[in-house]
Amino acid sequence: MKKLLLLLLVLPVLALAQPKQRPGVTYDAVITRVIDGDTVGIAATWLPAPLKPELSIRVFGVDTPEKGHRAQCASEAQRGEAASAFTKQLIAASQKRQIVLMDWDKYGGRVLGDVLLNGVSLRQQLIANGFAREYYGEAKTSWCQ
């Protein structure tokens, strides 16, 4: 209930805080951290206190393996760490970092979008290099098979 109340309070603030940002539009971004292979944190210093000045961006259209305690097996955890390391490596090697905003994810805590590194889609890189599968909200296939 508290999460729902917080979400109801935060969404109007977000809508008012950045009236220039529209879905499907590309913006320069400061990537603050890699959360996992398909999710990054970006600086959002425009968010009012007490909110964290960071938004989580989940790369739309892909699923990478989970890492750590969220993984269903040791193999998935290892692949999840590899996907995260790959994402970190691509970000570190890029000079131009941008995001393409799309929508809120189905849980409301992250923004769906794509990350462009030197103009190249992180989504495409993850899939092309075997670190992710295409995913559009359907039931996920296990990484442990």
Predicted regions and their residues:
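N-terminal signal peptide c-region/cleavage motif recognized by signal peptidases
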Residues: 10-14
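Sec-dependent signal peptide recognition
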Residues: 2-8
